[in-house]
Amino acid sequence: MNIKNYFNIKELVCKHVYNKFGEMAWTFFDPRLLETICVIREKLGKPITVNTWHSGGGLTQRGLRCNVCQLVAEKTRLEKVYVSAHLQGTALDFDVKGMTALEFVIGLRQIRYFFLIRYAWNKMSLGYT
C-alpha cells in the first residue's frame, strides 16, 4: 500500500510544517501510523479527511502539529506541559466521508477481525504454534 495513493502531505500536517519542509514532512510520521490510516482508507473504501487548510477549509491541527500551531503555542505560552502524539507523528484526528462515529467503529472492528483472521491463518499455514 502506498499512502500517497490516498493522501497528499498537506492533508496530514499543519501549514507551518508544510511551508518549511514540504514533501520531506513525510519523514516525521511513524510508519505504523501511515500504514494504519492507509489500511483503514483502503478497507473502508471511503475518503478520509484530516486537515483542510490547503483547500481553504478550517481544519488545521488534526494531523502533525508544531510549536507554532495555536493549540501548542497557547499551552506553551501558559507554561502548561503539552505532550501529544500529534507532535510526534503518531496520531491523527479524522472523519470518514459518509460515516458516523458509530459506523466507523463497526467498520474498524470488521477490519480488525479481518487482520486477526489473516494473522491466525498465516500462523497456521506456516506451522507456528
For each of these PLM feature ranges, what is it?
Residues 1-49:
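Active-site acidic/histidine clusters and adjacent loop/turn architecture
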Residues 8, 30, 69, 75-76, ...:
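Alpha-helix initiation/capping motif
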Residues 34-78:
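Extended, low-complexity, intrinsically disordered C-terminal regulatory tails
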Residues 79-129:
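Catalytic cores and adjacent binding grooves of peptidoglycan-active enzymes
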